[in-house]
Amino acid sequence: MRPRRLRILVACEESQAECSAFRSRGHMAFSCDLQPCRKGGHPEWHTQMDVRPLLKGNCSFRTQDGKPHQVKKWDLVIAHPPCTYLCKVSSIHMVKDGVLQQERYKSLLNARAFFLECLDANAYFVAVENPLPMARAELPPPSCYADPSWFGVKYTKKTLYWTKNLPPLVAKVVNPDARSFMHCSRGKYRSRTFPELAEAIADQWGNYILDHPP
């Protein structure tokens, strides 16, 4: 079945790390985020909008350069939904003095609904990324995990994936001296996708899909 140009949506990605990795391999990948793509990025590959209409496929959209696009169905959807209200680390803010914080709990429910909507994207191959969730989020068990140190990065950052019809990522060049990325970074930078991990995703999952068409 090779070669074939895959139609790929990378949801909630303004860095374009994964989008660029797939593009460099000849695939038709688009990133989508509420924010514009990073300065120096590729606006011709990025659409700034709510991603939910795109998750269903059979969609029309414009990239940041103003060019219209139409996709009947995605081959692969990778999503990075916000983890602010879902992750285990944030659970300490959910209850104060023994009282459930209702506004924060509502935000958790909204975040959970969006996460599940990403997981239910209209594509045969799907991967949703997030850190370890709090029990209160009641997310399904993750399918696998990966770590950037598996691909030579000097930091460790365990990343969970909820997948459909995709194999776990396989370590290639493990960095034995890697240290925790969580302890030396903050905010949005902490949630970044390392280029080495993005390259591994494009290689391993891209090739798997080409070799195992639905």
Residue locations for each model-derived region?
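Conserved active-site and SAM-binding loop architecture
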Residues: 1-214
